[in-house]
Amino acid sequence: MEGAEAGARATFGPWDYGVFATMLLVSTGIGLWVGLARGGQRSADDFFTGGRQLAAVPVGLSLAASFMSAVQVLGVPAEAARYGLKFLWMCVGQLLNSLLTALLFLPIFYRLGLTSTYQYLELRFSRAVRLCGTLQYLVATMLYTGIVIYAPALILNQVTGLDIWASLLSTGIICTLYTTVGGMKAVVWTDVFQVVVMLVGFWVILARGVMLMGGPWNVLSLAQNHSRINLMDFDPDPRSRYTFWTFVVGGSLVWLSMYGVNQAQVQRYVACHTERKAKLALLVNQLGLFLIVASAACCGIVMFVYYKDCDPLLTGRIAAPDQYMPLLVLDIFEDLPGVPGLFLACAYSGTLSTASTSINAMAAVTVEDLIKPRMPSLAPRKLVFISKGLSFIYGSTCLTVAALSSLLGGGVLQGSFTVMGVISGPLLGAFTLGMLLPACNTPGVLSGLTAGLAVSLWVAVGATLYPPGEQTMGVLPTSAAGCTNASVLPSPPGAANTSRGIPSSGMDSGRPAFADTFYAVSYLYYGALGTLTTMLCGALISYLTGPTKRSSLGPGLLWWDLARQTASVAPKEDTTTLEDSLVKGPEDIPAATKKPPGFRPEAETHPLYLGHDVETNL
């Protein structure tokens, strides 16, 4: 196809930038309007959880948008084009994550009425564990947000000439502005708009690509003939980058670390008015994730079919797989000015949603875990002012450190999942130990966190220094045999019918023994390694140092106690006594909206304590 063979670099035009600017302006307008409506925020709880009065549908769509950033918009289609439609198994991993979150983590966090996830670690273990979890979260979120902001700007610059700093500053300043002014409500409602933009962008690309390639049956037939319809890949080899098992086992644990215990997500579902609505939000989130991932994977298959005889990676038109998607958009919409701008808006909608989520969440844990424990008597208005200031500082910091993500190799999708897997995987193990193993103690969980982080970081660094070969990872073949344009750069020797990239492993005599075994494990297993190491080490050390007695634990901290737990922290107007809660049921009771200064939910002072009536002082 002519567009597939063109050697000159295409660029975005005025109409494209106009569409992009419109998306930024609408996002800003929504965020400011929601944030300033009804007099703004009167307390830190209003700023971070919207007063715990949010509806299920917008929260669910916000949950879906939070980790569906430009990294996924660019990375998922590229991976599907290179590895096939088996990428759809990720949806199964996400479904398992949603079920486990709804059954295990959500009830505990919601009924405790926490704003910061890491408050749980202090209630269950000690302040040292809480601070350790907070620090790990802040580091992981800073790195992840850096990838989300910088990588798409770099990729679009390399393909289209889009100015890196213009895109960084425009998106960074705008999301910092509406997050600082509007808080949680602004983040949620702009996320809803941005999910719609992402889906419309994918569907327009799908429709145009399928039409150009002769219809859906022709696309499926060509993809099948080139091994891209490969859902039945059940290879148990953990070194295969993508199989049913990597998505369902490794992928579900990575997503669980993002949704089950990650501050950004927990902060959203505890903002719902009732526990039942919070679970409904997770269901809406699952539907949103399925639509986004399925649309992105199908775009990848259409993209492969479009370039099947003239792979731009082999011909030198692009330098990395992540650049496939913007090139495809410019090629198939070259005669439709303004439509490529929709893709630009699609990509940066994901960036805005993730960055704003991260900024708000980092401000929340800083206030709840570092400021309020030391200054419990701060007035609500002062806390709001501090929260807004922290949002501005974190937004500025994310912009400043975004360039660090350029040090990560292997593609933006791998980079983002590696960061979350390495750092958040051990945290998932710590929370799971706390909720499921009554015997686990502070020395045990701290030892487990250290061991889990060390193991997952070891394999991630090893894989970066000694990357596995494409044959080991399972990259499918591509071709440049159909290229005829003289302006196309010459392919490397033997490039036809092969994929260009990392050379096959095993040829370098200097590679360590682990290079083709332990270091070659799929990056989706990094989180599982960290989680399992944390749990095993934490359990062992706990029993060796003297297990915690179950009777010494406060109510509401163990999952096993949920069956006999009959109440949750609730506003006075909704429930004032234990008898009321028995009638209404825990899933209908909203989480607490306010707590007295210096409140510490422990043993007999905790509203969940079964020896007292459930009553809050509002």
UniProtKB/Swiss-Prot annotation:
It is a multi-pass membrane protein. Residues 32-56, 106-130, 182-189, 267-278, 364-386, 438-441, 546-618 are cytoplasmic. This is Sodium/iodide cotransporter. InterPro entries: Na/Glc_symporter_sf, Na/solute_symporter, Na/solute_symporter_CS, SLC5A5, Sodium:Solute_Symporter_SSF. Belongs to the sodium:solute symporter (SSF) (TC 2.A.21) family. Glycans are attached at N485, N497. Keywords: Cell membrane, Cytoplasm, Glycoprotein, Ion transport, Membrane, Metal-binding, Phosphoprotein, Sodium, Sodium transport, Symport, Transmembrane, Transmembrane helix, Transport.
